[in-house]
Each structure stands twice: as structure tokens, then as C-alpha cells.
Amino acid sequence: MSKKKGSNTLAENRKARHDYFIEETYEAGIELVGTEVKSIRQGKANLKDSYAEIRNGEVFVRNMHISPYEQGNIYNKDPLRDRKLLLHKSEIYKLVGFTTQQGYTLIPLSLYLKHGRVKVSLAVAKGKKNYDKRDAMLEKAAKREMDRQIKERSRY
């Protein structure tokens, strides 16, 4: 029997690309308990308002909500607990260099499966101001209008 094709994305932070300029992305493993993995596989994870921070040379993701697994009983952990991200030391040193600069933060973009393991796409990001968001919306609307015009002209 062949493997299932399709998206392995389990959760996505959709507002991240709207609220931040993404500078670099890193792939990180995440330290989870078995019931958390089962809950994530059911699609019960939320990355909204989550961020990562570096403490004592280790990277932790905060405010990532993973709903308790229904059949998990005593093995369920706190849904909003800090979870350790697994990165190489050299990557952590690069992230420390970025985050010490003013305005940069670490944002998880998505949770996905890779070879049966849950991974986090972690981005080094800089916050957008309100006028940057408006400019991005205007550019997107102009591009959509141009595409509509091109499609309309090529129809005849």
C-alpha cells in the first residue's frame, strides 16, 4: 500500500506573515509528551500569539496551545506550558545574535510532520507597523486587480 500524499502541516500561524517581516526560518524539533503528539495529529494545536524565547542556552516556545487529548486522562499536561525546541548549538548562537538586536523576535510559523516527527518552522521576524500592513494590503489589491484585467483581456 502506498503512503498517503498530501500536506503534512498540522497547524499554521496565519497572522505571522501579516504582522511580521520574516527574515530567516529554521526547522526545529519539539519536545512533547505522547498525548500532546496525539492531540496535534488530531489538529488541536493553536500557534496564535505564540513566540519563542532563549533561556540558558535553550530555546522554548511559549503560549502554544495544545488541547488536552480526550483519552489521555492523567497523562495530559498543561495546554499552555513552555515546550523546549531542539536545535543545534550553532543555530541557537545565530538566534541569540538576531534576538539581541532591537525589534527582532522568534515566531513559530507552523507545526508539521517530517518522517513521523513533529517539527516547528521557527522564524526570525521583525514586527510590522500599521502603515506597513496598509501598504502590503494595497499592493496585494493592486496585484489582484492587474491579474483580473489580464485574465479579462486574454479571454477574447
Swiss-Prot record:
GO CC, any one term: cytosol
GO biological process annotation, one example: trans-translation
An annotated Gene Ontology molecular function: RNA binding
Localization: Cytoplasm
Organism domain of life: Bacteria
Keywords, sorted A to Z: Cytoplasm, RNA-binding
Primary site of residence: cytoplasm
Record InterPro entries: SmpB, SsrA-bd_prot, SsrA-bd_prot_CS
Family: Belongs to the SmpB family.
Function: Required for rescue of stalled ribosomes mediated by trans-translation. Binds to transfer-messenger RNA (tmRNA), required for stable association of tmRNA with ribosomes. tmRNA and SmpB together mimic tRNA shape, replacing the anticodon stem-loop with SmpB. tmRNA is encoded by the ssrA gene; the 2 termini fold to resemble tRNA(Ala) and it encodes a 'tag peptide', a short internal open reading frame. During trans-translation Ala-aminoacylated tmRNA acts like a tRNA, entering the A-site of stalled ribosomes, displacing the stalled mRNA.
Protein name, entry field: SsrA-binding protein
Organism: Clostridium botulinum (strain Hall / ATCC 3502 / NCTC 13319 / Type A)
Gene this chain is encoded by: smpB
